[in-house]
Amino acid sequence: NIRDDIEKTIPGFENYNERVRNHGGFYLPHCNREGRFDTAEAKAVFSISDYKNPELKENELIMMTIRSHDQFNTTIYGLDDRYRGIYNERRVVMLNKNDIKKLSLKDGDIVDLFNFDGGKERVAKKFIVVEYPIPESCAATYFPETNVLVPITSVAEKSNTPASKQVIIEIRNNNFQR
């Protein structure tokens, strides 16, 4: 079966079919957790990419999409993000308190998010403002709820995957009353 093939191929999966039936499960290898890196120096290797901050207009922010604790890739298992203290909701936009003030918003307001890349309007409606200790001029939203804001032409050079960590957005009050 496929698990037999996996255990022949991937280190740490030895006796997978037996171990998977153990009460409480088992840990798969994780080089970061174990402090073991398969490099010449047996250390992690970091690189710094050239990055130029985009010039933002007065009302623009840089949005990044993130995953919640209860999520694996696009599979959402629940509405809680215990990492960030956000519960029972995913349509949130996390903002720095100074940006909230600058945009004349308050924690809990309902807003719409816009992207105008290439002259095309993209909108994600009805997001709840959450004050969060994020750098100024930045916003964080959950993936895939704001994928609509990522231009289809905005992709990484080599992998051609959507570039969803630097999306320029505008935030407008929705005037929706909860």
What are these regions (language model features)?
Residues 1-19, 74, 79-94, 98-178:
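Long, contiguous, secondary-structure-rich segments that constitute the structural scaffold
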Residues 1-81:
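Long, low-complexity segments enriched in small/aliphatic residues
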